[in-house]
Amino acid sequence: YRGLAPTGRAAKVFSHHAGVPAYTIHRIIYRQQTFQGEGTRFSLGFNKLRHALFVVDEASMISSGVGSMGDSLFGTGELMDDLIRYVYSGEGCRLLLVGDTAQLPPVGEEDSPALRNDVLQRYGLLVGSADLTEVVRQSSESDVLSGATLLRNLLNEGFEGIPPIHTDPKGEVRALPGNELIESLVSDYQSFGADNVIVVTRSNKRANIYNNGIRSRIFDREEELTRNDLIMAVKNNYFWTAECAKSLGKDERM
């Protein structure tokens, strides 16, 4: 079989946990073509494998249209269409999509089309699905798991509005006043290290505000770029050549 994922980071995680090679969808299904006067594009390739199973992790990220993971530079611009066409162009090949319906859908989508049976059936596919309910990454007594399970159940019930979040001053999930945030972050950075502390926000705008505040008030860095800063690659370069000594994938840090 062949392991795939929408992003380089997801492919690395897949490969690490599965113990087998995994690649980005784009790397496997597209091939580079150069057109005179039009620059370089990537056309859909042909699946030469026979009777192979393609396992795609993080399938909730796969878009059904241009934008997000869909890009007019690649094939038809609709990643999901291209993926299905590629896989089933090979003799006897099958597709297994693995993902979490509770995660955020692709940009511009109300839900994750690659995880919907009715959407997949429109391609003329015989579709089977199953929900995995046993949690193996966290303790069954975890406050974080309890909160996540509550939110998932509310989503399944069609709940609308602001969901309740249960907190415990001495537990894993605590309500923290804004004026105590900086002090708490400083303590966590000192105790666990910067790589093990994550601030999650509801928007990119809010994330930038937090990042700038943490950078200036906790790490005392005012310049745009200083020594020991973490730099993240936010866009893949599909024109990379072997002349480069080292490359970074999207979302990787250096």
Predicted regions and their residues:
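ASCE P-loop NTPase helicase motor core
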Residues: Y1-G161
